[in-house]
A protein has these predicted regions:
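Short loop/helix-cap segments at secondary-structure boundaries that form the rim of catalytic
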Residues: 45-48, 121-126, 143-148, 186
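Conserved catalytic-core segment of nucleotide-activated headgroup transferases in glycan assembly
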Residues: 16-17, 21, 139-186
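A short, charged/proline- and glycine-enriched loop
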Residues: 1-3, 8-9, 50, 144-153
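Donor nucleotide-sugar binding/catalytic pocket of nucleotide-sugar-dependent glycosyltransferases
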Residues: 110-122, 128-143
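Short, charged N-terminal beta->alpha structural module
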Residues: 1-37, 166-173
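Short beta-strand/turn micro-motifs composed of small residues
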Residues: 7, 84, 114-116, 135, ...
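Extended catalytic core of nucleotide-activated donor transferases of GT-like folds
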Residues: 4, 8, 31-124
């Protein structure tokens, strides 16, 4: 089965297991042995090039509103799927035009991949499209275990409502004052 993966990321091709920045989206491409293409390259790809496409739509979708993304995606892939981005109703913080565009895009999918059971029920209920879980993948081949111990806490996510950074910080304070917070996402 030939799988194409599509996102706003600027790289093309397969992802090797020794990739230096094996984020979840990159790990999915690697684990599925998929070829990745950025959105602007869709128009250059052959008809029915892939049996299945997996797409991650960006949080900021305004630039896509006037691009024939759905038409190009369906031309290139025999089956089209989308992976939800962020928490289940994040998209409802967008402009009305973006919300309608996003919802209409979802309803044209053969399958919607979700993060968890709650999101699965939500997306199936609101779109009546088949939903399945696509769990987080960690490829740990290049992770070197620490040989020293430490007492600090690392918290992830940004300090915005969407990621609960402040909540994580409060929990970490219960454990230690030595806290490291990395910036990710938006």
């Amino acid at each position: 089965m030939k799988i194409g993966f599509f996102s706003e990321a600027g790289y093309e091709g397969k992802v090797e297991r020794n990739h230096p920045n094996m984020r979840t989206d990159v790990a999915w491409v690697c684990a599925l042995d998929a070829n990745h293409h950025p959105f602007p390259k869709l128009s250059t790809l052959s008809d029915d090039m892939y049996d299945v496409g997996v797409m991650i739509l960006p949080k900021k979708r305004k630039p896509l509103l006037n691009y024939p993304l759905l038409e190009q995606y369906k031309r290139v892939c025999k089956k089209v799927t989308v992976m939800q981005e962020s928490y289940y109703n994040y998209w409802q913080d967008s402009s009305i035009a973006e919300q309608i565009w996003y919802f209409n895009f979802l309803t044209e999918m053969d399958l919607i991949f979700c993060h968890n059971d709650v999101d699965l029920k939500y997306y199936n209920g609101i779109t009546n499209v088949r939903t399945e879980l696509l769990p987080t993948v960690m490829i740990t081949d290049n992770i070197v275990p620490r040989n020293e111990s430490g007492d600090g806490v690392i918290i992830g996510g940004n300090w915005v409502r969407d990621y609960g950074g402040f909540d994580s910080y409060q929990v970490a304070l219960e454990i230690t004052d030595d806290i490291t917070s990395i910036t990710t996402g938006r």
